[in-house]
């Protein structure tokens, strides 16, 4: 079993995580994906994971992180573009989401194929 695409590298220090915060944000109910184009297409993609203390105790936070890491390893890693950095910020719903659904949501966010937004005419319901 040889994979055609190599697994993404890791973001390891605070300055790398902070640099990605300046990039694009792709929001969702289960997690947020922050993406930064490093403008170096020949380099491998890199990924980092963040789970804040507000999301639960250490056991729950580690479980969220492990689920996201495994989803990236199994399927979402191949969707990552070379020369890009990704930070995945977990929300509590990561624990309750079925794993296949989590994988598909992660691929969707990484590829940037989110649901289309409402048009300006239908946006306000109060008028």
Curated annotation (Swiss-Prot):
Give the InterPro entries listed for this entry: Ribosomal_Su5_D2-typ_SF, Ribsml_uS5_D2-typ_fold_subgr, RNase_P
Q: Which GO terms describe its cellular component?
A: ribonuclease P complex
Q: Does the keyword ATP-binding apply?
A: no
Has keyword RNA-binding?
Answer: yes
Instruction: Write down the EC number.
Output: 3.1.26.5
Q: Which UniProt keywords apply?
A: Endonuclease, Hydrolase, Nuclease, RNA-binding, tRNA processing
Any one GO MF term held by the record is:
3'-tRNA processing endoribonuclease activity
Listed Pfam families: Ribonuclease_P
Any one Gene Ontology BP term: tRNA 5'-leader removal
Q: Which reaction does it catalyse?
A: Endonucleolytic cleavage of RNA, removing 5'-extranucleotides from tRNA precursor
Family recorded in the similarity comment: Belongs to the RnpA family.
Subunit structure of this chain's protein: Consists of a catalytic RNA component (M1 or rnpB) and a protein subunit.
The record's listing under HAMAP family reads: RNase_P (MF_00227)
Question: Function of this protein?
Answer: RNaseP catalyzes the removal of the 5'-leader sequence from pre-tRNA to produce the mature 5'-terminus. It can also cleave other RNA substrates such as 4.5S RNA. The protein component plays an auxiliary but essential role in vivo by binding to the 5'-leader sequence and broadening the substrate specificity of the ribozyme.
Any idea what this protein is called? Ribonuclease P protein component
């Amino acid at each position: 079993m040889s994979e055609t695409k190599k697994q993404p590298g890791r973001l390891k220090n605070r300055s790398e995580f902070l640099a990605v915060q300046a990039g694009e944000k792709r929001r969702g109910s289960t997690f947020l994906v922050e993406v930064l184009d490093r403008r170096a297409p020949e380099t491998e993609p890199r990924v980092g994971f963040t789970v804040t203390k507000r999301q639960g105790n250490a056991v729950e936070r580690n479980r969220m992180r492990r689920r996201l890491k495994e989803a990236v390893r199994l399927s979402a890693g191949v969707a990552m573009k070379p020369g890009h950095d990704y930070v995945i910020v977990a929300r509590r719903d990561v624990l309750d989401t079925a794993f296949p659904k989590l994988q598909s949501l992660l691929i969707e966010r990484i590829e940037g194929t989110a649901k289309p937004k409402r048009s300006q005419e239908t946006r306000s319901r109060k008028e």
